[in-house]
Amino acid sequence: MTDELLNERYALAIERIRQIPAEKSVPQPYRDFFAQMAQYLCKMDQIRSRIAEGYLKTASEEELAVFNREPYEDVIGERYETSYGNPAFAVRALGETHGRSLCCLYRELGNAVVWVYEDRLLELTAAMELYLELYAMFEEETLPSAQYVKESIYWYVSDYAEERQEYQVREIVDPSLHFVKDIVMESDLTDLRYLYQYGEYITENEKGTARFLNTFSQEEIDAMARTYTEGFRKCFLVARKDLSKKKTVSIRFHIGFERMIRAAILQFREMGLEPVISRGARRTWVAGASANKQYDYDHRNDEALYLNEDLVKRRLRAMQVKYDEYKELAGGYAGPAVVETFGEVPFEPVNKKQALHLNERQQKLRVGFQNEAGQIVNRYIKDDEYGYTIIAYPMPEIDPRYEKIFREIVKINTLDYEKYQRIQQYLIDALDEGASVQVLGKGENRTDLRVMLHHLNDPAKETNFENCVADCNIPVGEVFTSPSLTGTTGVLHVTGVYLNELYYRDLCLTLTDGMITAYDCANFEKEEDNRTYIEENLLYHHRTLPIGEFAIGTNTTAYVMAEQYSIAGKLPILIAEKMGPHFAMGDTCYAWAEDSPMYNPDGKEVIARENEVSAKRKEDPSKAYFGCHTDITIPYRELQSVAVEKADGTTIPLIEEGRFVLPGTEELNEPFG
C-alpha cells in the first residue's frame, strides 16, 4: 500500500472519529463506551501531531511526565475499577452480550500508544477502522448480535495476520528497525527527558535506574556491559558453536539501562554483531513499567474471543511465508542477550470470571500453534547454531538500600567463575556415581522427591551434569541435568515462589515417572481457582508436563546477600535458581539441539540431553516439546538434604541441613559465616 493511500485512510478515519463524542445515534449504555474510545483515539492523534512537531525534544521533564501518563490514566490505580478496560466493570456496565467483546476492543485500541510513537500508521489506521465498523453496527436500529461483533474482530485479526507476522519476524532478526536503537545511541543520557521518547509508561523505577547509572564512571559501565556481552560470546565458546558466521544479536532490556546498553552495542559491534532492538510482540523485550499488572492479567486470554482452527492455520502460513522471506536475516541471527530486572512488589492477580478464558478446544489450538510455530522457527533459526545470555539487576523499588543492593548484584554477576567451575566438578563427580538423587525439604517444606539419572556407558568420557558458570545464565553457578523420567517420583513443594512475575503460595507438584500428576497452591480460597492458576501460568494449558531439568545451585554468596537484605522473595529465577536445588517443568535445556554434542571443561560429553518425551522428536516433534521451561527453586533454608543414591544402595551426601558436606565443596559454606 502506498503512503498516500494509507494517509488518506487515516485522515478519513480520524475525521469521522472526531464527530462521534457529540453524536447520540448509539443507544446507552454503549454510547458512553464509544464516546470515550473516540476521545481516546483523538488524544492519540493529538499526541501524534505533537511528536511530529518536536514536543518530545522541547518540553520540560515535568511536562513530559504528564504527557507520558495521559494514554494510561484510565487504567492506573483506582481509575481501573470503573474503566471499560476492566472486564468486571465492562460486563457490569455493558452487559453479558457485548461487555467482553468491547472490553477486548478497548485493549486492542490501547496498543495505539506504541503505534503512535513508532509512527506505525498501518496498525493505527486498521484499529481505528475496526472501531468505526463496530460503531456503525451499534448505530443500526437493531443491535448487532454477539456473534456478529465477534466475527468483525475475528476478521480484523485474520485480515492483518500477515502484516503482523512480518513485523514480529523483523523484530527478531532485522537490524534496520531503529526506533529503540536511535534513542539509546543518539540521546543525551544525562538528560532524563530521553526516557519519555519510547511512549512506555515511566515511573520512578525507570528514572531512578537511569539516574543511578549516571553516577557510574564509564569504566564501571563498560565493565557491566562486558560481563553481559562476554557471557554471550562464552555461550558460543562453551557449546563449541561458531559465532563468526552470525551477524545480529537481539538486545532486550528494561528502560533506564541505556548507558549500559549503549556500551554493550559498541562491544557487540566489535564482535561483528549488529544489535536488533525492539519492544517485541507483547512489549516485553524493551519495556517500561506496567501501568497496571491486573489489567495485563485480565486480558491475557483475549484471543478466546476469536481463536479458531482457521486463524491458527492462517497465522502459521503467514509465519512460514515471512520466515522464508527473511531467511537470510534469520540465518545470521545469533540469539537474544537479555537484561532482566527485579525488585517490584510480587504481583498476586485476582481471577475474574468476566475475563475471557480459552475453552478446552482453544487451549489445544494454542498448544498446537506453539508446537508448530516452534518447528517453523527452528527451521530458520537453528537451535544448534543459536546462543543467548541473561543477566539481571534490581530496580529502585526493591528496597531503600537499592544502591547498595545494586552494587552487590554487580559483584555477584562477576564472581570468579574458575573457582566455581573447580568446586562444581566435585559435585559432578559424585553425582556421576549415582543412579538417582534424593531431595528432602524440612520444616514447612514437604518436598520428598527422587530424581533418576541416565546410565553412563563410559564414565571416563561421559557425564550427566553440565558444569555451568557465567556464560548463558549469569551469575555463576549450578550443575544441571535432564533427568530420566521413569522412576522420577515424589512431591516438589515450596512455601512461596515468584515465577514469571507471578507469585505462588504453597506450590505443590506431584510427579509420577517424571510427569506432573497433581498440582495445587494456596493463592485463592477455591481449589478450582488455584488449579486454573497453575494450568494457565505454569502448565500453559498442557494436561501435564515432564520434569525437564534437575540442578543444584552453588551460589551461596547470592543467597546470603538475599537473606541479609531480606529480598529473597523478589529475586528473579535467574539468580534464585543458583541458590539451592531447582527443578524445571517443561522442555529440557537442550530442546531442539539434543543431537549436538555438549562438553564440560574437563572434556567429558554431557550425554543427558534428552528424556523419554523429547526422544519422540524424530517421529513427531509435536509430542516432544512443550514450549515452556519454568524453574522452581528450594532455598537452602527449606532444605533437609540432597544425597546421591548409588546402584548398590549406598549414598553420598551432598547437602545436609542446608549446608554443603561433600568433600571439596566446603568452601561454598564460607558466605554463611
Name every feature range the model reports, one short phrase each.
Residues R252, S278, I391, L440-K442, ...:
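Generic beta-strand/beta-sheet core signal
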Residues G256, E344-P346, M395, E444, ...:
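Short, glycine-/Ser/Thr-/acidic-enriched flexible segments
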Residues A518-Y590, E594:
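Dual-mode signal for accessory low-complexity, basic/Gly-rich regions
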Residues S484-H541:
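Long, well-ordered mid-to-C-terminal structural blocks that present hydrophobic/aromatic surfaces
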Residues D602-G673:
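Extended hydrophobic packing segments that form well-structured cores
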Residues Q375, I423-Q424, V476-V479, L492-V497, ...:
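Glycine-rich, charged/polar anion/phosphate-binding loops
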Residues M1-T486, I655-G673:
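Active-site bordering "gate/hinge" segments
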Residues G487-T489, Y504-D506, D513-I516, L545-E549, ...:
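Active-site lining segments that contact anionic ligands and/or coordinate catalytic metals
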